[in-house]
């Protein structure tokens, strides 16, 4: 059906309700380089056409409302409205469509991820004409992207700060996540760091509870870091979680981390919010702190294939808001993760120029305009047998974040850390020598066991541990 357009400034106002597609479905529209583009997966209600649904999404996420209003005549509607410019069916799915929508850049506040998401996804997901709606991808134009500071430092600066090159980084989340005293917590940190890990981490649940107040934890962790650094000669760190109930308290904790001289802090960016995260990122940039970002609550938003927001969008907006690390799943571990989709979003976290690649779920090319890179963190149910696959999938510019795969070693935390480090270095060396990690990964680990009793013990404990479940959200 040919598009119908209407200029409110030249047409006499008529009260009433009219179809969204009259104004907001514009298949002849030529996308501008300054437009923010969005790809939505739509599932219309029975009897509702995809054109009407796509137009409704464009309207409700920009200038439209459910009825004609006379104040439309006081502005240039054609200048400010969102436009559904293309709709395509989803292959293999019944009654699902991808709607492509263009938004004028004037609709968004500069440097505000909060405003961007409030506009695009803030209200339209509850629209009754849709059974389900999912934001699959965004294209951020260069002129808008340049209003964001992005990550505090980025991968290259982080490696310079740590003086660590040519291999992936290793971390460990301290377990049990809740219940330890600050002193015992610090002891666990020390054992992991002296064994060969680069980082240890507060779990996202750990903030400042009665059994371990934040100030005590910070002190004992700093003591562990300095002791391990002195013994190993390597720079070490612990992700001190500064997430708090208000921003004033968050800054107080970050200030204390600066006074202690530690290299990195942590924030839960979804539960803490984008406004707090952007503010904390700016603080870290100004005070020389690295910022580790945890994605607690993400699966509530991104796991269902038909409704919500894909993680690639969350990763994109986090790179704009700011962070040096971001948890990104593992594919092979205990958490949800599709291999092709994971390739797509770890590339957009690290690279400067991303090309459209529907095989990896990337709907739009994206030029990051030199914005600093974001290091993926592979975390969740991983152990030494996973190391070849992890290195093959993620490459060197990644932090491999163990938990039980370090602390569950039969000889203790330090031995678990040794096993992790030996496995990583063995796989890195084999890859550098031209061996296929996919084909020979298990053989590489077995060969390394001959030279490390700690790795051999770890391999024996976890030789039959797998997480073979079907992926809910896959391409």
Swiss-Prot record:
Modified residues (N6,N6,N6-trimethyllysine): 14
Keyword vocabulary terms for this entry: Calvin cycle, Carbon dioxide fixation, Disulfide bond, Lyase, Magnesium, Metal-binding, Methylation, Monooxygenase, Oxidoreductase, Photorespiration, Plastid
GO MF term list: magnesium ion binding; monooxygenase activity; ribulose-bisphosphate carboxylase activity
Site (Transition state stabilizer): 334
EC number(s) reported in the record: 4.1.1.39
Catalytic activity: 2 (2R)-3-phosphoglycerate + 2 H(+) = D-ribulose 1,5-bisphosphate + CO2 + H2O; D-ribulose 1,5-bisphosphate + O2 = 2-phosphoglycolate + (2R)-3-phosphoglycerate + 2 H(+)
Positions with a binding annotation for substrate: 123, 173, 177, 295, 327, 379
Any one GO biological process: carbon fixation
Residues annotated as the enzyme's active site: 175, 294
Misc. comment: The basic functional RuBisCO is composed of a large chain homodimer in a 'head-to-tail' conformation. In form I RuBisCO this homodimer is arranged in a barrel-like tetramer with the small subunits forming a tetrameric 'cap' on each end of the 'barrel'.
Record protein name field: Ribulose bisphosphate carboxylase large chain
Gene behind this protein: rbcL
């Amino acid at each position: 059906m040919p598009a119908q357009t209407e200029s409110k400034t030249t047409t006499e106002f008529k009260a009433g309700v009219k179809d969204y597609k009259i104004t907001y479905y514009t298949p002849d529209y030529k996308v501008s380089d300054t437009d923010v583009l969005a790809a939505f997966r739509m599932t219309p209600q029975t009897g509702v056409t995809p054109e009407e649904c796509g137009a409704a999404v464009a309207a409700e996420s920009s200038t439209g409302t459910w009825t004609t209003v006379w104040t439309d005549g006081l502005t240039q509607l054609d200048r400010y409205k969102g436009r559904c410019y293309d709709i395509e069916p989803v292959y293999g799915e019944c009654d699902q469509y991808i709607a492509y929508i263009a938004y004028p850049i004037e609709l968004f506040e500069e440097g505000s991820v909060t405003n961007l998401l409030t506009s695009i996804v803030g209200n339209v997901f509850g629209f009754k004409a849709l059974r389900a709606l999912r934001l699959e991808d965004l294209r951020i134009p260069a002129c808008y992207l340049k209003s964001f500071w992005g990550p505090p430092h980025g991968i290259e600066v982080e490696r310079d700060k740590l003086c660590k090159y040519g291999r992936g980084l290793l971390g460990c989340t301290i377990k049990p996540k809740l219940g330890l005293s600050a002193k015992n917590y610090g002891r666990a940190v020390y054992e992991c760091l002296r064994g060969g890990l680069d980082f240890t981490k507060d779990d996202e649940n750990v903030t400042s509870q009665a059994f371990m107040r934040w100030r005590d934890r910070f002190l004992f962790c700093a003591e562990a870091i300095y002791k391990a650094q002195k013994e190993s000669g390597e720079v070490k760190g612990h992700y001190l979680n500064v997430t708090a109930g208000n921003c004033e308290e968050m800054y107080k904790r970050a200030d204390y981390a600066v006074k202690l001289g530690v290299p990195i802090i942590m924030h839960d960016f979804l539960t803490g919010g984008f406004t707090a995260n952007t503010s904390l990122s700016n603080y870290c940039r100004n005070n020389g702190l690295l910022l580790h970002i945890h994605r607690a609550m993400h699966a509530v938003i991104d796991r269902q294939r038909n409704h919500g927001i894909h993680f690639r969008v969350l990763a994109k907006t986090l790179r704009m808001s700011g962070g040096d690390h971001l948890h990104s799943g593992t594919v092979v571990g205990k958490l949800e993760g599709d291999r092709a989709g994971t390739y797509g979003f770890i590339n957009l976290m690290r690279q400067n120029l991303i090309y459209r690649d529907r095989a990896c779920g990337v709907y739009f090319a994206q030029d990051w305009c030199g914005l600093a890179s974001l290091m993926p963190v592979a975390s969740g149910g991983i152990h030494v047998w996973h190391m070849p696959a992890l290195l093959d999938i993620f490459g060197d510019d990644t932090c491999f974040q163990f938990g039980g795969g370090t602390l569950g070693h039969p000889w203790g935390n330090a031995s678990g850390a040794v096993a992790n480090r030996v496995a990583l270095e063995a796989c890195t060396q084999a890859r550098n020598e031209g061996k296929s990690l996919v084909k020979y990964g298990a053989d590489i680990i077995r060969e390394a066991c001959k030279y490390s009793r700690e790795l051999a013990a770890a391999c024996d404990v976890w030789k039959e541990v797998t997480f073979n479940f079907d992926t809910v959200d896959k391409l």
